[in-house]
Amino acid sequence: TSTLSWLDEITMEELERNPY
């Protein structure tokens, strides 16, 4: 789940910037 940690953070940031 360590990999998901940074992935989740990046996804959250991307969603905040470009909410599809």
Swiss-Prot record:
**Signal peptide (residue range):** none
The Swiss-Prot or TrEMBL record lists the needed cofactor(s) as:
heme
Q: Which residues form a coiled coil?
A: none
Induction cue: By 2-ethoxyphenol.
Give the GO molecular function terms: metal ion binding; monooxygenase activity
Q: Which family does it belong to?
A: Belongs to the cytochrome P450 family.
* The protein's name: Cytochrome P450-RR1
